A protein has these predicted regions:
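Nucleic-acid endo/exonuclease domains
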Residues: 1-117
């Protein structure tokens, strides 16, 4: 599944909980960095990291360095950044973590399909 496909899946998961994020939000005042998903009121950004198993740009050399700089600058600006993989989107872990960060209760535990209390 391509990164954009994974982002579409995650966007649908968010919408199922009536969470409407800003997409490709430019967060830095001088750099062109963007977050895949942004919940501006909560200062929460979610990045779907593609290519984690195929040796994509984000997992090698200069791409990894650039991402580290981006996330450090986001932290300095007060953002919480949740980085998730495609597998975590598909398994439901990414939406679970997002909901918990927002203080919401997930419908089911993504690992066991049991209701979360």
């Amino acid at each position: 599944m391509k990164s954009s496909d994974l982002e579409n899946v995650f966007a649908m998961q968010l919408r199922s909980y009536n969470i409407i994020p800003e997409l490709e939000y430019r967060f830095h005042p001088t750099r062109r960095w963007r977050f895949d998903f942004c919940l501006q009121d909560e200062k929460l950004a979610i990045e779907v990291e593609g290519g984690t198993w195929s040796g994509g740009r984000h997992t090698r050399g200069s791409g990894f360095e650039a991402d580290a700089e981006k996330y450090a600058e986001a932290l300095v600006l007060g953002w919480r950044v949740l980085r998730v993989t495609g597998h975590q989107v598909k398994s439901g872990k990414a939406i679970d973590w997002t909901l918990r960060l927002l203080g919401k209760t997930p419908r089911k535990n993504p690992e066991t399909t049991e209701k979360v209390e």
